[in-house]
Amino acid sequence: MAVGIENTIEEARFVEQARNFDIQRVIVKIGSSLLTNNGRGLDRTAIYEWAKQIAQLHKQGVEVLLVSSGAVAEGVVRMNLEERPKKLAALQACASVGQMGLIETWWSALIQYGIQSSQLLLTHDDLSNRSRYLNTTGALTQLLEWRVLPVINENDTITIDEIKFGDNDTLGAMAAAMVNADLYIILTDQEGVFTDNPRNNPHARMIRQERAMADYLFDIAGDGGKLGRGGMLTKIRAGRLAAMGGCPTVIVSGAIDDVITRVVSGEAVGTLLTTNDQDKIIARKQWLAAHLRMSGSLIVDAGAAKAVVEHQKSLLPVGVSEVRGDFDEGDVVEIVHQDTGERIAVGQVNFSSRDACRVARERTEQFDRILGNNEERVVMVHRDNLALTM
């Protein structure tokens, strides 16, 4: 099939798929290179242009959440530093200084259209701890009800490397899951995802539409892939993470005229990463496996370990010999083999640590007696909410 015809077919599929979305809530993520004109300070002209597009969506009743990088780069400029600092304390200080300018600029750009904006700085702990996750979700929901536009960024001033999201692509995907977004738009300095590096290969073709879980995307964008690193790998990973909540992702150049409104209207610009029900389960398991902080541990006997690892079964309370830590229902915990001490899986637990202790080593028919009548929970960790780590 000729490349031109193939591209036309892909564009038609893109438009058809995009127009099937009922888009009421959108996450827009803008990276540092775009926001700061490749590190030369905040590009206010570009920011005001994106604000104009966001205002058009806002006027149509579409709720927009913005994930904005650029605090460290702006801090470097404001402090007249010759280069980006390497020491953690200096980087955190730059983030503190630059965040002021970042939020100030977004506020000024949006208020001219009558849009109130707010600042929300998050850490990995805020989203890995269930109670803080729910509190954050509640605050975001209230802001949206008030028609306030949240501007979200990682709290680089207090975050250490070991518990960083690593990039705002990931943070945007997690925000999409928090608020059940209908679309996640990642604005970048590339037109989309290509089959090869277009700078080196004139025959490289942009991928207009693909499943977020398609393995070959990692081959293209991975560390050893054709495109090298270049940031595209994290964007594809973020697309997979957004797929966990059923949210499609568009990766597209932020330099395209009216790019945000054109994407939301269903125009074929950039690369659309789609999802389906099976992809949600696969992406969810990957998200669980990537969790940095565990809220507690479930120590399991050999029989339960075999059921989980070899037969991909749910973890039943009868196989749990010990509960460690203080956690709530819905928190992510590790599952550890009692004989080897090895972590075999991580998963989202259906019981608080208090109730887990009460039902550990007990059979299902005893739950009503232990926890009260009409107890519906029968598994400690469901297999769909469990990811193997060995």
From Swiss-Prot:
User: Which keywords, in A-to-Z order, does the entry hold?
Assistant: Amino-acid biosynthesis, ATP-binding, Cytoplasm, Kinase, Nucleotide-binding, Proline biosynthesis, Transferase
Q: What class of enzyme is it?
A: transferase
Q: Does the keyword ATP-binding apply?
A: yes
Recorded GO terms, molecular function?
A: ATP binding; glutamate 5-kinase activity; RNA binding
What subcellular locations does the record give? Cytoplasm
Binding of ATP, residues: 29, 188-189
The GO biological-process annotations, alphabetized, read as:
L-proline biosynthetic process
Matching CDD domains, A to Z? AAK_G5K_ProB, PUA_G5K
UniProt pathway: Amino-acid biosynthesis; L-proline biosynthesis; L-glutamate 5-semialdehyde from L-glutamate: step 1/2
The residues that the entry says bind substrate are: 69, 156, 168
Domain PUA, first and last residues per copy: 295-374
The reply to whether Manganese figures as a keyword in the UniProt entry is: no
Q: Which GO terms describe its cellular component?
A: cytosol
Record's InterPro entries? AceGlu_kinase-like_sf, Asp/Glu/Uridylate_kinase, G5K_ProB, Glu/AcGlu_kinase, Glu_5kinase, Glu_5kinase/COase_Synthase, Glutamate_5-kinase_CS, PUA
> Would you say which domain of life the source belongs to?
Bacteria
Catalyses:
L-glutamate + ATP = L-glutamyl 5-phosphate + ADP
- Annotated EC: 2.7.2.11
What family does the Swiss-Prot or TrEMBL record give for this protein? Belongs to the glutamate 5-kinase family.
User: What job does the chain carry out?
Assistant: Catalyzes the transfer of a phosphate group to glutamate to form L-glutamate 5-phosphate.
User: What is the recorded name of this protein?
Assistant: Glutamate 5-kinase
